Structure formats: C-alpha cells, structure tokens
Amino acid sequence: MPRILLSFLLVYSLTIAQAQETIPFRITKYNNILVSSVVNRKDSLDLMFQIAMEEASISPERKRSADHIVFKDGISDGNTVTIGKNIYRDVRFFDDELTGHEADGKIGTGIFKGKIFGIDYDNNRFSVYETMPSLKGYQAVPLVNRNGQLFIQAENVIDGIPVAADFLLQSGYSGGIIYSNAFADGKDLDQKLKITGEKTLRNSAGKSITTKNGILPLLKIGNFTLKDVSAGFFTGDLKTQKASYLGADVLKRFNWIFDAERKTVFIKPSKYFTEAYFKMN
C-alpha cells in the first residue's frame, strides 16, 4: 500500500473516533448538570440535563422568561434549542415541571437520539460520536432502556450480603441512591444501614411517609466498588417510590459513554470517584 494512502487512512481512522460535537456544562453544588441554551432563538435558559427523560420541560419556578415557547394543553412541539454551536430542532417541551436548583427547566437525552454520546465529568462536557471512541480504562455495563428511561444493575452489600438491584439513572436527584419500596420492604434497612437522618410527612388523610438516609458500605457497579454510599429509602403507609435511583452523586463518580442503541454503557472512574458524598437534609 502506498505510504501516502496509508498515512491518510491512519489520520482518517483517528479523526472519526474523535467527538463530532462537544457541549460544555457546569455542575452545581447539588451535583446537577446545567447547560446554557437559547430556545427558539429568543429565550436564554439554563436547562438541567435529565438523563431519565428524552424530552425537555420548563419549570414554574424559573427565573428567566420562556415567552417564546408556546404551549397547548401543557405541550409545545417543534422548538429549536441552541446549546453552544449545536442546534437541535423539533424539541418537545412540557410545561410546569419542577427541576433542579439554579435551573429554568430540563432537557433530556432526545438531543442525542441515535448517536453515541459521553458524559465527561473530568472535563465538564458532553461528547457526541459517529463511531465508538477509545474505550481504554472503561468497562462495559449492560443497559436496559424502558420507554426512554435507562437502567443498570448494581450490587448492594447489605449486612455483608450482596443483593442485586436495577437502578434508574436519575441525574435530577442530588444524592447517591434511593431504593424503591419494592426493594426496601422486608430488608430491615433501618437496622442494617447506619442511619444519618430521617423526616416524616403526613397527608390530609393522616397517612405518613418517612424518608430515611443511611450509609451503604459497598456498592458494586461492574468491577468498580464504591464505599460508604449515601442511600435513601422510605417507610410508612404511602408507597410511592416505584424505582430505585442511581443519583447524581454516584453518576458523577464515573465518566460515561452510551452506545447508539442504548444497550451498553461504558464507565470508568472520574476525578470525583472518592469524593465525600453530598449530605441530604
């Protein structure tokens, strides 16, 4: 093979593995990812990235105007969202959905639909790829896509016994993990975990729900092990927690690369891997 052609192919192979798009973000003190956006070329909004949804939404508590997003029955279709140099079209917004601190609304994974994308916590950016980038140092973890919501399995070591659970990736929750009622019931977590705080609420019918925060000694994701993980669960009459959450305080401890089909995610520890956990009130 001629040397010039060989050199061209080498350069080309390196080029296609590089990011086709990069989107800068910032991380709030509540562990949420925020991107600066302009919607419909008029409304400047800070949107929280919510990995647990595909569409976008506007918060009733927003501080900035969103007058150029026109809603009908709580839904607005056909919007254009500009983030940095990237323009995303036909974005659906929902109205009046609460979001994280400092944000005017949320934006989901729909802007990456059909593409490989990465969350790079080390460099505060999303990366979008046409082909899979280098996976050196990464480990493959099976991913389950349920109606646009992404789940992975992790092993919880409770009282010395490993127990598997499916976790919804939930970047809107600032803490470590939350257990579903189905997982927590019958496991005596308030006795087997070190409890760091609790709060009880009652509804108008007198039914109660108690939020308890504790410390899980070990959480294993693939071959990676996190220690002393902040873990929340609920007790009481009301059973409202349908899924276990892998929250933002765990998500940020890894860099993530999602395949285009959302069947596999590749993870490796980030600079936050051993950082102290966020304290939930």
Per-range role (PLM):
Residues 18-281:
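Pepsin/retropepsin-fold aspartyl endopeptidases
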Residues 1-24:
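Bacterial Sec-dependent N-terminal signal peptides
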